[in-house]
């Protein structure tokens, strides 16, 4: 409400776990909870959403929390 009149959009990107150097047991336990693909996200699963938020395609989007976790929080 305060920044919108100045043309400033405020959004949040909330990724779930992203595959990195987690132990096998952590990955296995996490993957059981994921609805899509039964796997942790890869960086290339997250980057398109970030590009969208930076682009003109999201020029009328503000105040949103874009959760990208493969359905883990369902």
What is the predicted role of each segment?
Residues 4, 9, 61-63:
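Short, small/polar-rich loop/turn modules that mediate ligand/substrate recognition or access, typified
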Residues 3, 49-50, 54-57:
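Conserved alpha-helical elements of the SDR catalytic core
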Residues 1, 5, 12-35, 45:
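A glycine/serine/threonine-rich, flexible loop-to-helix segment
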Residues 19, 59, 72:
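Functionally critical, cavity-lining and gating residues within the transmembrane helices
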Residues 35-46, 57:
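A conserved structural motif in NAD(P)-dependent oxidoreductases
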Residues 33, 51, 62-74:
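Short C-terminal tail/terminal secondary-structure segment
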Residues 9-19, 54, 67-69:
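Conserved SDR Rossmann-fold cofactor-binding beta-strand/turn motif
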């Amino acid at each position: 409400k305060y920044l919108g009149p100045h043309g400033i959009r405020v959004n949040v990107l909330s990724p779930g776990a992203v595959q990195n150097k987690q132990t096998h047991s952590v990955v296995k336990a996490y993957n059981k909870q994921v609805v899509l693909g039964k796997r942790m996200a890869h960086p290339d699963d997250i980057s398109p959403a970030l590009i969208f938020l930076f682009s003109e395609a999201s020029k009328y989007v503000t105040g949103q929390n874009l959760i990208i976790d493969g359905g883990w929080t369902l």
